[in-house]
Regions:
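Rieske [2Fe-2S] iron-sulfur-binding subdomain
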Residues: 1-84, 105, 118-193
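N-terminal pre-triad scaffold of radical SAM enzymes
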Residues: 72, 87-91, 98-99
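Basic side chains
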Residues: 79, 93-95
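Short cysteine-rich clusters marking metal-coordination/redox-active sites
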Residues: 92, 111
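Cys/His-rich metal-chelating microdomains
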Residues: 95-98, 117
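Short beta-strand
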Residues: 102
Length: 193
């Protein structure tokens, strides 16, 4: 079977990439631009593993937030009223409108479309005009959240509710990185796109 006949995911295609450095070959070019490859990475890596989202110093106070898109998911990373760091969906549960942009500070999250308002923990607290809807319970419509944990000043998120805790996932990295005092580092420059 020729290389061109093999699936992009066929392990045989990548044997040479794991050879000793003096014998190794690079990854095939299509892994860098294939939508099929990207989709597989999203499902097998980015939706299952811990991902760095921001730094704790970017959201030092209650109400501070950073709005991000991670694997096509609109998220807001924020510090709630109790100082807990949370990762919430940035799409309103009513009509899917974008709730926030950029970064800043807020006391609540309010949708610009119909003014649904959420507490900083994601709880739906105000729904103008919904009082007329039968059987509507605000408690049934919080903002979806993803796991958020911190280490070394970094805020990590994970879309997989069953993933191992962050520190367990980091394994020996925590000890190896200890001399670098990551928690003392500060963001001094951001890449604006």
């Amino acid at each position: 079977v020729s290389v061109t006949d093999q699936s992009i995911f066929s392990p045989e295609r990548y044997v040479g990439t794991r050879a000793p450095i003096e014998e190794a070959v690079p990854l095939p070019p299509e892994v860098y631009f294939s939508e099929e490859w990207y989709d597989r990475e999203v499902e097998t890596i980015f939706r299952r593993e811990w991902l760095v989202a921001t730094r704790e110093e970017e959201i030092p106070n209650p109400g501070d937030y950073v709005r991000l898109d991670i694997v096509d998911e609109p998220l807001v990373i924020l510090r709630d009223d109790d100082g807990v760091i949370r990762a919430l969906s940035a799409s309103c549960r009513h009509r899917g409108s974008e709730l926030m942009t950029g970064s800043g500070n807020c006391r609540r999250i309010t949708c610009p479309y119909h003014a649904w308002s959420y507490a900083l923990d994601g709880e739906l607290i105000a729904t103008p005009a919904m009082h007329e809807a039968d059987d509507f319970d605000k408690a049934d419509h919080p903002l979806p959240s993803v796991r958020a944990e911190t280490w070394g000043g970094f805020v990590f998120i994970n879309f997989d509710p069953d993933a191992k805790p962050l520190l367990e996932s980091l394994g020996g990295l925590v000890e190896r990185m200890a001399p670098y005092r990551m928690e003392e580092m500060k963001v001094t420059r951001k890449w604006e796109n």
